[in-house]
């Protein structure tokens, strides 16, 4: 008996030794990141994706991942080019087959190109403040999430702010809509038209060709039109060009309000004193006074693991926006684990469910250290947006200063536009919308 027991012990020990690495190996949650850090919009991408990746690193360093699941990622350079964006997606999706966080392209054009592909591949497409906005209707677009708020709700909120500034009545007023002549710039036109019809003001749409460094003719027309306000939908070099042109023709920057893609430090600092007084909408705040941002700098950069070469970008609008996008993405992973298994890597399909069932309250944001960084988010099958709120901020020559609380666009006016557009899309594509009353 004794002689036969010893070999059995050895065999058992060898067996356990063989199994140990498998049992102890940490699960990994992969994030495919089709990013851009070069090209005409590279500076914007550097800040956004730097913030996004820093938060993933922070969660790994601070919390050892999400319930022990390590967050990993791989970037692919798109240069903000639609074709390259699709190539990057195709290159990365194989690695996302077993587990995938939401895909963030930070490009409306690339997002449009991936709407159908991501649904076929069952990978959730996050479009936080950009992208195809009728995807708010999750019954038609189950895998696309224009989270936080949309161009149309932002435009509506801006009009609400202007109305308040002009004494509560827009009848007989004139608003110019100066926009980047692209899918991004055109998205808000329908909302501006609806608001003009409702509030009885004259809308003057003026397009600017990509990349937007030539705006002489547009600003000549603005001077001739003499609008009460200019609502500005720019991107990249177009933004500083517009501010300098406004100064040149004598249009007050205090009567210009831009979208959130015209409201970063990268937009105003190059314009110098031409930017002072200019306002822009935002769905996240700037600054390091947000506890989470300060702690990321302490933990991640203090540990030599920061993604940014230029640390002065920490706390900027776009850096904080990248952190905000990562916060919502990681919260989706956490939510998915609650349903499908804590400590396990989640598939794209499981993360999709979580993104459709987010409920990120102010109390939860406080726990994360993200109080006032972004608004509360509550999504559902028929509402992939989750908030619809923005703040208006003003550049004082050195920093962005909030000049409003959270403002919600006119949901009763705007959301039916999404539903009508989504219904038409479903008809064209032969899609049978889901019954949201049966989704849990």
Residue ranges of predicted features:
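Periplasmic-binding protein-like
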Residues: 92-107, 124-128, 174-179, 205, ...
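Extracellular/periplasmic Venus flytrap/periplasmic-binding protein
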Residues: 84, 133-134, 142-249, 287-294
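Extracytoplasmic "Venus flytrap"
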Residues: 28-53, 76-83, 107, 178-187, ...
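Beta-alpha junction/loop-to-helix N-cap segments that form part of ligand/metal-binding clefts
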Residues: 28-30, 43-50, 61-138, 147, ...
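Sec/Tat signal peptide C-region and signal peptidase I cleavage site
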Residues: 19-25
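Extracellular/periplasmic periplasmic-binding protein-like sensory domains
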Residues: 246-326, 421, 433
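Segments of small-molecule ligand-sensing domains
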Residues: 307-319, 330-405, 409
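Bacterial N-terminal signal peptides
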Residues: 11-19
